[in-house]
Amino acid sequence: MRALRAGLTLALGAGLGAAAEHWRRREGKAPGLLGRVPLLPVVAADLPALPGGPAGGTGELAKYGLPGVAQLRSRESYVLSYDPRTRGALWVLEQLRPERLRGDGDRSACDFREDDSVHAYHRATNADYRGSGFDRGHLAAAANHRWSQRAMDDTFYLSNVAPQVPHLNQNAWNNLERYSRSLTRTYQNVYVCTGPLFLPRTEADGKSYVKYQVIGKNHVAVPTHFFKVLILEAAGGQIELRSYVMPNAPVDETIPLERFLVPIESIERASGLLFVPNILARAGNLKAITAGSK
């Protein structure tokens, strides 16, 4: 318990702390991982409001409720922040330990299912994926949570899924997931934050556009890329950071994974999340691993 609190606090920031506390008060208690995690990733839009503003303050402005707040979901095996616009997660956070990779969790007993905690207007369904040509790609991988059937079942909520090109899902991305699990043999704790990216492309007119496909009647957004950030606790207190980006396209699985390492700043800029300031605030020894580094 103490290690979980310390590690997740190392990795992640306080920006959503208020939202998490609101969620706890509303529910009376927080089930699953969220009940043990005090601080979550920072999204710029969720940072505390600046002082000032209209007379009467936010209390009067919120008389009829706010149209939306951070949608946190806590499961047995992970925590996610949900984006109702894309019908998917902004990020999913999980902790990998050797004992959690073993157990009675049986994938054949799992079924993909809607997340009933998400409003019907804003959630994906299995019908959205049917005939789309995309896999239902896990963000928190099922194989990461064999330690209980419930933990594995929770990875099959469609809120933990994104449309993924089958060749990527079954090959290069799967290799990255397997590599992440293998690091539990070397590091004391492995924290994994995974999410979608929607990156701009420069077109023939010289202008840059963010364009992405949507699938199904619920218009589930198809990411252009995916990121995975690994926060690794080594012996002696050193924290290592490895950050990867892969395109949502067929990728040659023989390409070494280190070719997909990117500076963490590029993920922070593209995703709107912040990792490094929060790690540095709690750890004096951070080593960022990038392509070609030793």
UniProtKB/Swiss-Prot annotation:
PTM section of the record: GSK3-beta-mediated phosphorylation at Thr-125 is necessary for its interaction with YWHAG and the induction of autophagy.
Gene Ontology biological-process entries: apoptotic DNA fragmentation; cellular response to calcium ion; cellular response to glucose stimulus; cellular response to hypoxia; cellular response to oxidative stress; DNA catabolic process; DNA damage response; in utero embryonic development
Annotated site (Essential for catalytic activity): R107
Entry keyword set: Disulfide bond, Endonuclease, Hydrolase, Magnesium, Metal-binding, Mitochondrion, Nuclease, Phosphoprotein, Transit peptide
Cofactor (UniProt): Mg(2+)
Family from the record: Belongs to the DNA/RNA non-specific endonuclease family.
Function statement: Endonuclease that preferentially catalyzes the cleavage of double-stranded 5-hydroxymethylcytosine (5hmC)-modified DNA. The 5hmC-modified nucleotide does not increase the binding affinity, but instead increases the efficiency of cutting and specifies the site of cleavage for the modified DNAs. Shows significantly higher affinity for four-stranded Holliday junction over duplex and single-stranded DNAs. Promotes conservative recombination when the DNA is 5hmC-modified.
Stated name of the protein: Endonuclease G, mitochondrial
Source organism (scientific name): Mus musculus (Mouse)
